[in-house]
Structures are given as C-alpha cells and as structure tokens.
C-alpha cells in the first residue's frame, strides 16, 4: 500500500515504488505551499497526519513526476481545500531545516499566492482544523512563520530571531511580488 501522505508514486512513474522511496529518503523533495489570503488573514490548516501532526501550516504537497508547478498548486488546493485555483503567482522558496534536524525528509517548498479561485472552502481529512490568521498561531512550522512575516502577509508570534531592519529573506523575490509577474 502506498503512503497516503506523499502520493508521489503514480502508475506512469519511471521508477518502481521501492526505487522511488530509496531515492526519496536521500534527496530534497520539491513541494508547493498554497498561500490563500482573505479579509481575515492567511488560511492555515492544522495537520491531522504525520509528519508534524497537530502543527498549523500552509496547505502543501509534493510535486509529482512530470507535473508543472501551477498544476501541483491547483491539485493541492483542490484536494486539501476544495478550491479551484484559476490564478496564482510564485512568492518564493521555503527550506525546512527543522525537518532535517528532526531526521525527517528534506522538503524544499515553492510558495504560491493564490490570486484567483472559486469554490467553497472544504478542508480534507488531512487537516483536523483550519483558520484565518492575521497573527500567526503558536505551534506552526517556524520556517513558514518566518516566510509569511517576511512576505508581509501576517504577523509572527514568538519569532526567536527577528531579522535586522531592512534585511531580506533569501527565499523571497520582492521584485516578483512588486511587479505582479
């Protein structure tokens, strides 16, 4: 039985399932992080599954073999939030050293701001809760807190190391954010 969290192996994948998991454990995993904003802040879900069960986070998922990033964003938003994404734009990259320090896999997330969508919000069974936040809750991925604060999308709670005034996060391309590209 395939791991329902990762869903990375498809029937048309060029590797066997055993080969896929052997490689998967040894290399960074590309993910997309879905950023949906509204009048009440940023939409977060609380994970009901491992890894990081019980933590607040941006909905996200592994990019599948042969999948375009925009298609991965649309798939994850549909599966985890019940939303149909019609437009999104890349905000930047999130690395997860806290995962590496815990001996977990090694994700590298590309965050996309959903700028246009349709449908009614309906979170999947992968989430035990969801909420809209202007001030980010405790119990959230620290890397995602830093990213959202640096992007100016939310206020952080309990950031251990504030960035010096004027310092940019290396994962956020402000030119792309400002130009709307």
Question: What do these predicted ranges mean?
Answer:
Residues 84-93:
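A short coil-to-beta-strand element that immediately follows conserved catalytic motifs
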Residues 147-181:
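Charged phosphate-binding loop/patch that engages nucleotide di/tri-phosphates or the phosphate backbone
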Residues 41-80:
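Conserved Nudix-box catalytic region and its N-terminal flanking loop in Nudix hydrolases
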Residues 36, 44, 114-116, 132:
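Conserved hydrophobic "DFG−1" position in protein kinase catalytic cores
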Residues 94-120, 152:
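Active-site-adjacent beta-strand/loop module that shapes the phosphate/pyrophosphate-binding cleft
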Residues 1-33:
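Acidic, metal-coordinating catalytic segment for phosphate/diphosphate chemistry
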Residues 111, 122-153, 178:
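NUDIX/MutT-family hydrolases
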């Amino acid at each position: 039985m395939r791991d329902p969290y990762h869903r990375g192996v498809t029937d048309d994948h060029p590797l066997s399932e055993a080969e896929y998991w052997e490689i998967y454990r040894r290399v960074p995993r590309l993910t997309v992080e879905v950023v949906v904003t509204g009048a009440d802040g940023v939409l977060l879900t609380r994970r009901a599954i491992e890894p990081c069960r019980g933590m607040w986070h941006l909905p996200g998922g592994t990019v599948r073999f042969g999948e375009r990033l925009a298609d991965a964003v649309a798939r994850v938003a549909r599966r985890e939030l019940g939303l149909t994404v019609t437009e999104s734009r890349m905000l930047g990259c999130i690395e997860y050293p806290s995962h590496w320090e815990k001996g977990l896999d090694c994700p590298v997330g590309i965050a996309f701001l959903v700028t246009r969508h349709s449908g009614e919000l309906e979170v999947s069974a992968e989430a035990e809760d969801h909420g809209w936040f202007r001030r980010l809750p405790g119990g959230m991925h620290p890397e995602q807190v830093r990213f959202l604060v640096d992007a100016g999308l939310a206020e952080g709670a309990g950031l251990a190391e504030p960035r010096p005034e004027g310092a940019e996060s290396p994962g956020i391309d402000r030119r792309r954010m400002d130009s709307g590209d």
